[in-house]
Amino acid sequence: MAFLLFAVVAAITPGPSNIMLTAAGANAGVLKGLPCLFGVATGMGLMMFLVPFGLGSLVLKTPRLLSVLHWGGAAFLLWLAWKIVTSGRRESAAERDPVGYVGATVFQWINPKSWLVSTSAAGTFLHPEAGSAMSQSAALGALFVLAALPSGFVWLAFGATVQHALHDERRRRIFNIVMGALLALSVALIVW
């Protein structure tokens, strides 16, 4: 129960994935944003399984790999922030495609918040007397997916809710600048 609460709080608080989901909802609507939502949940579920199961210890014991993930992830997130800021208005929601399932799944592996959440969970919620590392890690991954789906949907729906207010080009531009700036700020807060 403690981990589920942790997972809900981690999944619903602002961060790069939720900003991406909000932008997906605002620019393409809920239905076209669902693959992005499922990708975020899948990526975090896999990460929550693999990091506690052993990948995390490899990354933490290899400073160069950790540094590459740290700075490479930050660079990618800043690039994504720039793409959000500079995205132009298209004619219809049907023409706007948000980040898809695979992109959102892979995105979790370069998202600094995802690494912080999964390594924190590994250190906090794995217990030697609670069973094998594999079974505990599988439970963490499954529970995180259960928490991430409704939590991420809140952000996706929020974006879709503001979509009607963004028909005006000036408002859409301001919204995209704010979303991109928030993503860049989240990178700065996590990295430095």
Predicted regions and their residues:
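Juxtamembrane transmembrane-helix termini in multi-pass membrane transport proteins
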Residues: 1-67, 120-140
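Anionic-ligand binding region
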Residues: 96-105, 111, 122
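Selective transmembrane alpha-helices of multi-pass membrane proteins
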Residues: 61-89, 151-155, 164-192
